[in-house]
């Protein structure tokens, strides 16, 4: 290919001319590399040119505004029995009646769907109308497969809050509280959002699962959830054969909350006030929540200074050890290693002898079967959390965050 065609890089086309426009921008004239196409009626391939026509199409910007003109051949149908006499050549980049190149449509979809940009901003950036951009998005939504046709083996369920609580007045029932919670169901393998339901109770999740076909539900092997009794009830009711995997992020979050509550309680008991920056434990409160294996030598030294100077009873250090012990349980490579780490953790919990660590230990025991499933399958809710973040981003982009 010549240099201009290489730079323009429109698949199956080459540049035959390019000029500067008087009011700015450039006009690029392209033509297909090969001449010939099948008749849309009979399918017979023809290479006989009847006439040439020119069509202006939209394409992705190239270092500024570019006006793309396509030189198209109008071919003569070679089949005498066909009712169509002539037809215009089509390609993968310019299908029949297309006004935009295929790569422009792909770029629009990537900007709107993958990056969550507003339709109006994408239309302005690519120099097309809002209606054109929205039509591309609508066309992509139409071809999305039905949920029941997808082969989902690992399912992720998680809730997210999208606004504050609202009260609406029902003429028949009076004031009604509307919870700002929604539950997202995601294919853990691909990250594709399968459904979004109102609320975060078991009835909402059960209703969505029961609406699926029996064959679809039978294929579900593992469901990843956070430590939620409502989600657990919905899964055991609608998917009794599926195993439940508890998300490790939420367990570590509970361990960090346990440590934070111990720190806050100790400050109140010893100083009768809230923590201040003069207190080493408060000043290094985020350091206490970090994993010990991720700390540098300098950070570990600061951590030792916190325990030496601001932990007279040793309860803070004991709670920190329980938090790290739980992390070791979740990081265990095998089930036997996890059980051994759990036994060590039990000793640390008994030694700490605080209400906060005992409550954390009871939670771990209550969800231990789900922890075992996580250790053996490593199915987490990471993609579900990512989907929730994307949903919130789309709502904010659409000015729907109020």
Where on the chain are the PLM-derived regions?
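Short, conserved DNA-binding cores of transcription-related domains
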Residues: 1-84
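Residues immediately flanking
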Residues: 32, 79, 159, 188, ...
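Acidic/histidine-rich catalytic cores and adjacent linkers
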Residues: 41, 47, 177-179, 187-192, ...
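RNase H-like nuclease fold core
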Residues: 47, 132, 136-222, 229-234
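Extended interfacial segments that mediate partner engagement and assembly in macromolecular machines
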Residues: 68-75, 83-157, 166-167
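A structural signal for short, well-ordered beta-strand segments and their strand-loop junctions
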Residues: 122, 156, 224, 244-247
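Short secondary-structure boundary/capping segments
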Residues: 140, 171-172, 237-243, 259-263
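Short alpha-helix plus adjacent loop in nuclease-associated cores
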Residues: 251-272
